[in-house]
From Swiss-Prot:
GO terms for molecular function: IgE binding; serine-type endopeptidase inhibitor activity. Residues 25-79 form the TIL domain. The lineage of its organism: Eukaryota, Metazoa, Ecdysozoa, Nematoda, Chromadorea. Belongs to the serine protease inhibitor-like (TIL domain-containing) family. Residues 1-22 form the signal peptide. It is found in: Secreted. InterPro entries: Ser_inhib-like_sf, SerProtInhib-TIL_Domain, TIL_dom. Disulfide bonds join 25-58, 34-54, 38-50, 42-79, 60-73. This is Chymotrypsin inhibitor Ani s 6. Inhibits alpha-chymotrypsin, but not trypsin. Coiled coil: none annotated.
Length: 84
């Protein structure tokens, strides 16, 4: 009985968290049901090599990259080096 109740509560929590995030993405981000967790970042310029796996969460919009691993999404031009 405990296992079935625990499983039911767990499924409700997962479903709630999954659908609650769709409308609450930070600026310059959008929700993706199956996004690649290896996003471009300013500090590396390219995504790292990793296995493709679906992640359902907010990702940077087209033309934006992460400032840092868990940072905000900024325009790609923001990361380009300044030449003097």
């Amino acid at each position: 009985m405990f296992q079935s109740t625990f499983f039911l509560v767990l499924m409700v929590c997962v479903a709630t968290a999954r659908f609650a995030n769709k409308d609450h993405c930070p600026p310059n981000e959008e929700y993706n049901e199956c996004g690649n967790p290896c996003q471009e970042k300013c500090d590396n310029g390219e995504p790292v090599i990793c296995t493709y796996q679906c992640e359902h969460r907010c990702f940077c919009k087209q033309g934006y990259v992460r400032l840092t691993e868990d940072g905000e999404c900024v325009p790609e031009e923001f990361c380009k080096p300044i030449h003097y």
